[in-house]
């Protein structure tokens, strides 16, 4: 009986471990493992020509389906429609990555945080 109890306990732990890992990742608001930030930044720069650089990117999930993002986006000095640029960046994030809530800080000069 003790050996059988240990075997059952091991099976329960083994099957629950993935759920514990995923739950811990969500509770700690970790970044989604599938998201390639470099690829995402490159895609935004290609789709929105007024964007000349991206940094300070932070992505986390409140749930596996509810992703949040903050980023700094450097805008070309000659860009005139900053609101339109931000809308296109947000559309790319939502359409391609499912990031429905994003905060985009625009910069036309050096970042004040550096």
Question: PLM features: what roles do these ranges have?
Answer:
Residues 1-114:
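Alpha-helical transmembrane segments and adjacent TM-loop junctions that form the membrane-embedded core
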């Amino acid at each position: 009986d003790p050996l059988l109890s240990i075997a059952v306990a091991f099976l329960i732990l083994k099957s629950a471990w993935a759920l514990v890992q995923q739950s811990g990742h969500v509770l700690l608001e970790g970044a989604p493992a599938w998201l390639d930030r470099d690829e995402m930044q490159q895609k935004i720069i290609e789709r929105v020509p007024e964007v000349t650089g991206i940094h300070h990117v932070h992505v986390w999930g409140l749930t596996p389906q509810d992703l949040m993002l903050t980023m700094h986006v450097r805008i070309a000095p000659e860009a005139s429609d900053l609101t339109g640029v931000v809308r296109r960046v947000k559309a790319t994030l939502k359409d391609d990555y499912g990031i429905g809530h994003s905060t985009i800080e625009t910069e036309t000069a050096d970042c004040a945080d550096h």
